[in-house]
Amino acid sequence: MNVAYAKIEIGLPAPIRVLHASDTHLTHADERDGQRKVELAKNRLACFPEADERLAALGKLSLEMELPIMHTGDLIDFVSLANMEAAKAFADSHDIFMATGNHEFSLYVGEAWEDEDYRNQSLAKIQACYKNDIRMSSRVIRNGDAAINFVALDNGYYYFEPRQLAFLKEQVALGLPIVLMIHTPLYERKLYDDARARSGGCAYLAGVPDELIEDYEPYRYRQQKTDATTAEFLEYVAAEPLIKCILAGHLHVDYDSTFAGRIPQLISGGSAARVVEFY
């Protein structure tokens, strides 16, 4: 696994360092889940042949550097007993704080419309693999007088919920600098343009203005259309001075973006771990 480095100035009296990773996409399955799942695993392994090696390297790096892992989702590629066992074993033996992605709840990868009902089919089983609430939680990390509140929220389906916005406001009220952890990056124009050029289709971002997704094919338009709460969420983040950085994934490319003209948005593509030092 490659290792990248970033330094983000947020005015701390002492530095705080973490490991950011995303989109590992473990592809394990065996006979316990049936032949269809075994075949899915074989097909998806071709997309992510180094997933196990990268996760092992990430864990080794975390232990050697004594840094917590801030993972922004898709640690597994689909729901299976073997994937859940691997995820739980990793979480039990490493310091990992998790913001879920969309693939955490994917049963067969693209076989159905993914929404709250779809997610809830496997949510309890996936949640049991991790120590923190993977849909909405916070963790304060300190170094002497320095402190950062890492706030992990699930936006794997391209939207935010009212309760997530309320939770973020509660965290802001604590008065600590915040690093927002999400799976799907937030829209800003340069990232949008680059993402569309790279994909040849849609941008796969949250909060894209409607006029910029009108030419998406119908499935992607429905999937990525910004609702009122998501628009309000982005407006709040843009205006809140305590939100200092965003960690994200989903795009399968390492990319440094700036949200709202001021907030660094660090996107992990899955092939590298990034040591992020806040100071």
What are these regions (language model features)?
Residues 18-20, 69-71, 98, 180, ...:
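Residue-level marker for buried hydrophobic side chains located in beta-strands
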Residues 13-36, 105-106, 181-205:
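Short, solvent-exposed beta-strand-terminating loops
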Residues 1-84:
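N-terminal active-site segment of His-dependent metallophosphoesterases
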Residues 23, 73-74, 101-102, 183, ...:
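Active-site glycine-centered loops adjacent to acidic/histidine catalytic or metal-binding residues
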Residues 22-53, 107-130, 190, 222:
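Acidic/histidine-rich helix-loop elements
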Residues 57-68, 149, 158-256:
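His/acidic metal-ligating clusters that form di-metal
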Residues 7-10, 80-179, 203-206, 256-278:
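Extended active-site neighborhood of metal-dependent phosphoesterases/phosphodiesterases
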Residues 44-48, 73-77, 154-159, 219-224:
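The substrate-binding groove and active-site-proximal loops of carbohydrate-active enzymes
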